[in-house]
């Protein structure tokens, strides 16, 4: 494989592509340029979710970093498959465990992972594929809306509101923006992790359909 540089471009319409928990879940922005931001962590999460949904039960396409995963348990799978004691990780066990994890987990051989845990140590993997933050082409304006819910959570809330049973909330969206992120694939690291041409095609498919299964009230168009 040769080195690949690529761009991921997507647009956002009346959606919040990546809320900032430090700012009340408002869309992330660069405080100097006021351009919208989507973190690389957010983009990788969507790629992982797509692979997990579309490659379920396909050998070699398991996902290491997934919701509610217990990472030690995932690494114990490697030790058990190789006949090692997870409580006695040595250099031999670590190196063999790292290769097993790369072979079986798509996101490890793609993005890398730190697996240097005390138990079932599988070392570290530097991934061949790296993504930048996505940044909007122009500065964005965050629209804020007040929303109401015609119900309350507890009887006490109902009593406090004298039966009105309404709760208020806020919702933030980006009216419209085009975002772009830069990425690269390092062929030398790909050789080390076993990242293949087929893996690259799978990654491209995931990026093309990044938001297909990501629609929600905050992202009605999936973006």
Question: Which residue ranges define each predicted feature?
Answer:
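RNA-binding basic/glycine-rich loop and surface signature characteristic of RAMP-family CRISPR effectors
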Residues: 1-223
